[in-house]
């Protein structure tokens, strides 16, 4: 089978390619020009939706994959990926019902097209040949295509799964979910509360779903109710609020996932989905979760009074533009620089190579939105960074750091194929580079971005950590084979993290939305943050530019296991869990050594800001 030569890193778009992808270029130019003219992307997005959806239908309908020419195939699929990314971007804006319907039709069209692509017999032959190639970029691409085919569900199964997941989400946000408070009622609880107030308390008390009217009221109730027994009763009832609604759709999700696992020869979906991870068995995940378990001296329903007694972490208030400047100054040692086109538009370079554009806008919350993913030799990236005008609270700084880290991670990938940059395998290795960059950028200020000891923020972080640990245990157990669970008694898992009992703990899976979407992989966020911390602590003597190239750029397309081996010497589950344990006890120790070959012996080591 003929295979085209990889394009040079600085190659541009040929006229024919530019013509075939002109609508996406028009869309990108539209967004860039709106930023240059001071027009908010939120105002421009609705006008671009019809253009995008028209292109979506046309492109998907005419999609005929050319498996005999890899470079042509990459350009064809790149068009689909770009449309899908732009679709996700526009869905983040307030749109009319008609515009949402247009985007939904586009999403369905893209899903059907990708289903046809992954079902093509020629794709199996292509990945087989790529797996035998000596080029690491091609091997990485083959690995990702193989994984997508393995995870692929038929149209009917996918429709049933997505329908059940949608029913679960709807079941938890229905307006007619009510609690009978009885003697535990408080006056005025029927009135809506301001979601902007008591944000730390609300986030700590709410479930994983976005706060709605009822969730805000529950958070406020727990803050105001002085009777601990009433708090416990209402909290437990709230956690089981959607049991009747979600029992059937969640059972459908379990059955579909079990069927998928059996089709691949695994006894449970937990065994199947974990088989390709760094933590490759349910027992590996359980060991990590047990190592991350730390019993708090209060119950979840008693968090409110604990927060009320604590003080907030004091921070220095800075403008969003000042925070952005400080962060980009801290990126310079990594080889990253920014060319300012105007106040709202930056071009980002890495050692002189253009990575893409960063559009800056103001909003109520710090966040990152991806418009177009960077692919070396194919296209530069484009992201929008939304920043609050004033960064006042600790959370403001933390989310600003996280948002810029996400933007830089999206722009800096060194893959020459879209999937090599967008799909990190194994999945529990994905996000580790971004999490490391967050830790690095947290040192950009003269003050610490860690909560003060005993502060509200520290209490909330500790609570959220243990809540995630408990949820991960519930998710893991829910998808394991009957009689072979790592956590057969979930009430004991709850009591290991919290100072309280919960007899109806089995109700939790019905009001825990992420269980149907992420399943046994719910532990990923915890794991990635902890692994990034272990890398950070272990490599404080390394030049951070080396770590940035290794963890985020990865132009040589090294598998994550090989990169972790270069850092830790081994990358088996037991070694990584031990490194995480060590990092938790050695976090504030400095080191002047670096495990990476060819490291800069003159590098003095990275120092953290002074602790509070």
Language-model features: locations:
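C-terminal, non-catalytic "cap/extension" segments appended to globular domains
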Residues: 43-46, 335, 408, 472-612
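N-terminal helix-rich structural modules
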Residues: 27-33, 41-201, 514, 520, ...
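Active-site recognition of the HExxH zinc-binding catalytic motif
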Residues: 386-414
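Generic, well-ordered alpha-helical scaffold segments in large soluble proteins
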Residues: 237, 252-263, 272-275, 288-295, ...
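N-terminal secretory signal peptides that target proteins for export/translocation
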Residues: 1-19
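Active-site-proximal, well-structured secondary-structure segments within enzyme catalytic domains
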Residues: 211, 225-226, 250-385, 443-448, ...
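Metalloprotease/metallohydrolase-associated module, dominated by Zn2+-dependent proteases
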Residues: 294, 424-504, 612
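Structured, charged N-terminal subsegments at the starts of enzyme catalytic cores
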Residues: 166-304
């Amino acid at each position: 089978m003929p295979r085209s030569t990889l394009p040079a890193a600085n190659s541009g778009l040929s006229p024919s390619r530019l013509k075939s992808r002109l609508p996406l270029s028009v869309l990108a130019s539209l967004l860039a020009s709106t930023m240059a003219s001071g027009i908010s992307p939120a105002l421009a997005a609705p006008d671009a939706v019809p253009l995008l959806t028209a292109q979506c239908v046309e492109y998907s309908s005419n999609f005929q994959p050319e498996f005999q020419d890899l470079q042509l195939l990459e350009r064809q699929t790149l068009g689909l990926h770009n449309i899908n990314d732009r679709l996700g971007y526009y869905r983040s804006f307030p749109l009319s019902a008609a515009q949402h319907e247009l985007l939904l039709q586009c999403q369905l069209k893209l899903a059907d097209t990708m289903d046809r692509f992954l079902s093509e017999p020629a794709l199996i032959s292509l990945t087989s040949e790529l797996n035998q190639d000596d080029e690491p970029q091609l091997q990485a691409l083959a690995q990702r295509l193989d994984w997508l085919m393995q995870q692929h569900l038929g149209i009917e199964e996918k429709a049933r799964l997505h329908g059940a997941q949608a029913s679960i989400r709807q079941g938890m946000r229905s307006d007619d979910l009510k609690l009978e408070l009885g003697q535990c009622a408080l006056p005025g609880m029927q009135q809506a509360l301001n979601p902007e107030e008591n944000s730390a308390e609300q986030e700590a008390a709410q479930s994983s779903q976005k706060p709605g009217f009822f969730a805000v009221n529950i958070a406020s109730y727990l803050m105001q109710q002085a009777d601990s027994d009433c708090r416990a009763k209402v909290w437990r009832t709230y956690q089981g609020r959607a049991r009747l609604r979600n029992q059937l759709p969640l059972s459908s999700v379990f059955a579909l996932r079990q069927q998928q696992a059996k089709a691949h020869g695994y006894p449970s979906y937990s065994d199947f989905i974990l088989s390709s991870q760094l933590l490759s068995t349910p027992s590996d995940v359980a060991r990590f979760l047990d190592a991350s378990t730390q019993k708090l001296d209060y119950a979840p329903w008693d968090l409110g009074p604990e927060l009320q007694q604590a003080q907030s972490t004091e921070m220095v208030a800075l403008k969003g533009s000042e925070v952005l400047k400080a962060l980009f100054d801290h990126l310079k040692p990594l080889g990253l620089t920014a060319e300012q086109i105007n106040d709202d538009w930056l071009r980002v370079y890495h050692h002189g190579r253009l990575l893409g554009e960063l559009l800056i806008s103001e909003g109520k919350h710090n966040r990152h939105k991806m418009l177009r993913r960077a692919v070396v030799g194919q296209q530069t990236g484009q992201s929008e960074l939304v920043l609050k005008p004033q960064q006042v609270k600790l959370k403001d700084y933390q989310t600003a750091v996280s948002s810029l880290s996400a933007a830089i991670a999206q722009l800096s990938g060194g893959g020459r194929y879209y999937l090599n940059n967008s799909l990190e395998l194994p999945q529990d290795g994905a996000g580790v580079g971004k999490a490391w960059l967050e830790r690095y950028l947290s040192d950009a200020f003269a003050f610490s971005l860690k909560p003060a000891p005993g502060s509200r923020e520290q209490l909330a972080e500790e609570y959220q950590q243990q809540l995630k640990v408990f949820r991960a245990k519930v998710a893991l157990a829910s998808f394991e084979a009957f009689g072979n669970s790592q956590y057969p008694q979930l009430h004991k898992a709850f009591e290991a993290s919290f100072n309280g009992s919960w007899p109806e703990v089995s109700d939790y899976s019905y009001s825990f939305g992420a269980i149907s979407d992420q399943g046994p992989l719910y532990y990923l966020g915890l794991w990635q943050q902890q692994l990034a911390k272990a890398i950070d602590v272990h490599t404080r003597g390394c030049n951070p530019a080396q770590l940035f190239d290794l963890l985020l750029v990865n132009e040589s397309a090294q598998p994550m296991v090989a990169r972790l081996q270069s850092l830790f010497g081994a990358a088996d589950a037991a070694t990584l869990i031990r490194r995480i344990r060590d990092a938790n006890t050695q976090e504030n120790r400095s080191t002047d050594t670096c495990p990476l070959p060819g490291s800069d012996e003159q590098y003095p080591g990275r120092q953290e800001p002074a602790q509070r």
